[in-house]
């Protein structure tokens, strides 16, 4: 539901029926079409079209060109507001809508992308070697998929008449190579740089003084980096994900429930913090090689109270063991729920049954929310037509990060000023940037998600 917020000022004043732009669509001009015929087709005024396409005031319509068409939403006469009221619609606060309103004549920018393609180490003449690269998710496949997402975002932005000069560099996952790339004039003349992917490489590159003024986007990892001037940490840092989940646990877990904390030796700090918050909780230490004895877990879960289990680990064997054992403990008399303050990629392993996570109502914070659709979306269909496959999470991440940062740079090259805008949502990610004390920007946005049967739902906090 689209929300309309009305700010009441000094004097009451009736608003008569009018329209606001709630969204936009792209129209491809057909043969013999005029501005008037297009306006009649969409039941809008010619002035509405000119508002979003100012270049048409000075030039004629061209066949097969794309123009923006406003989708108008009526504001009813019965609404009374005060004079000079401010009306704000969710869609009007989106960056693409803001860009359309602030559009400058020159909607071009230079984008440099630094990714570890490692093209010099791949024997492309060997079919077996190339095929083996794509068998599992690895740095090479992540790089290619993320790059595909970047290309898709650039293609998408063409509909807004945005031109991107793309320069791609293979870092070869080498610090020496990064030094060579940093001296390239194309990089030094960039409006924005995406990459490198690897935290160590990114920190080295972001410390190069000559590139300090150019925004550099760290796109994928939650591993902490120094968010110095020019650095854009697009992934919400791990500590913020944890803190948000801790707040959720404090507000939603009953201290009288049977709370069990399972934490490995690498998570002593969060283990201690949770134990302080829930002093009556039961603590379980994993056995050698990250396993929990089934008889121990069985003895600590009860039928008389809800069982709330918090697991803190990034060891796959432990996570897999806990999920499987907890699921087997669920009965009509025994209720078991699972939580974590940080969900790593280990939970994505196919050997962890998603139905088990659903049975446990597994709850956590995340930087992204997977699309839950029974049918192919417009986004997926267009990607399929362009690239011949369905987009995975790395593709979508590449798309989301790229579209957001390019729109920000086009709106205002001083990215600090774009922190005033509302949270921006895309396909699976959202962005709400804040200023770090070291001078850079970090994304503070996240989802609280819960598994339900085979789906994942977002928990909207009131």
List each language-model region with its residue ranges.
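Extracellular/periplasmic periplasmic-binding protein-like sensory domains
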Residues: 323-397
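Extracytoplasmic ligand/sensor domains, especially the bilobed periplasmic-binding protein
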Residues: 194-195, 201-274
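Structural motif
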Residues: 165-184, 290-300
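Periplasmic-binding protein-like
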Residues: 186-198, 217-219, 257-264, 304-322, ...
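Segments of small-molecule ligand-sensing domains
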Residues: 388-395, 402, 406-456
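Bacterial Sec-dependent N-terminal signal peptides
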Residues: 1-26, 457-462
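A solvent-exposed, charged loop/short amphipathic helix patch at secondary-structure junctions
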Residues: 120-141
């Amino acid at each position: 539901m689209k929300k309309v917020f009305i700010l009441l000022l000094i004097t009451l004043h009736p608003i008569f029926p009018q329209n606001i732009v709630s969204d936009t669509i792209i129209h491809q001009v057909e043969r013999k079409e005029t501005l008037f015929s297009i306006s009649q087709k969409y039941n809008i005024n010619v002035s509405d079209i000119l508002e979003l396409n100012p270049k048409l005031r000075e030039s004629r319509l061209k066949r097969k060109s794309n123009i923006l068409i406003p989708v108008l939403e009526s504001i009813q006469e019965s609404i009374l507001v005060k004079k000079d009221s401010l009306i704000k619609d969710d869609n009007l606060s989106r960056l693409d809508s803001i860009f359309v309103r602030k559009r400058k004549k020159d909607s071009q920018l230079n984008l440099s992308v630094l990714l570890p393609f490692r093209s010099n180490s791949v024997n492309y003449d060997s079919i077996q070697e190339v095929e083996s690269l794509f068998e599992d998710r690895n740095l090479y496949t992540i790089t290619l998929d993320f790059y595909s997402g970047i290309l898709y975002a650039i293609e998408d932005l063409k509909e807004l008449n945005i031109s991107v000069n793309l320069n791609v560099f293979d870092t070869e996952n080498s610090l020496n190579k990064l030094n060579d790339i940093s001296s390239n004039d194309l990089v030094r003349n960039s409006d924005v740089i995406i990459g490198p992917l690897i935290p160590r490489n990114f920190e080295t590159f972001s410390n190069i003084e000559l590139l300090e003024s150019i925004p550099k986007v760290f796109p994928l990892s939650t591993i902490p980096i120094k968010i110095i001037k020019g650095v854009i940490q697009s992934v919400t840092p791990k500590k913020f994900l944890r803190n948000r989940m801790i707040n959720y646990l404090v507000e939603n877990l009953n201290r009288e429930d049977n709370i069990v904390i399972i934490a490995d030796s690498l998570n002593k700090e969060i283990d201690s913090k949770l134990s302080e918050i829930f002093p009556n909780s039961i603590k379980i230490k994993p056995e050698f090689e990250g396993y929990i004895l089934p008889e121990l877990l069985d003895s600590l879960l009860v039928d008389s109270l809800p069982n709330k289990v918090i697991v803190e680990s990034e060891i796959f064997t432990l996570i897999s063991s806990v999920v499987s054992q907890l699921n087997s403990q669920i009965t009509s008399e025994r209720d078991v729920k699972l939580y974590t303050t940080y969900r790593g990629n280990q939970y994505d392993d196919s050997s962890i049954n998603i139905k088990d996570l659903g049975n446990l109502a597994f709850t956590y914070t995340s930087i992204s929310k997977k699309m839950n659709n029974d049918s192919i979306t417009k986004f997926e269909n267009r990607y399929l037509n362009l690239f011949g496959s369905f987009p995975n999470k790395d593709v979508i991440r590449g798309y989301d990060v790229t579209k957001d940062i390019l729109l920000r740079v086009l709106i205002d090259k001083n990215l600090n000023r774009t922190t005033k805008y509302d949270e921006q949502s895309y396909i699976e990610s959202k962005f709400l940037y804040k200023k770090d004390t070291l001078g850079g920007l970090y994304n503070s946005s996240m989802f609280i998600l819960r598994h339900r049967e085979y789906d994942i739902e977002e928990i909207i906090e009131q």
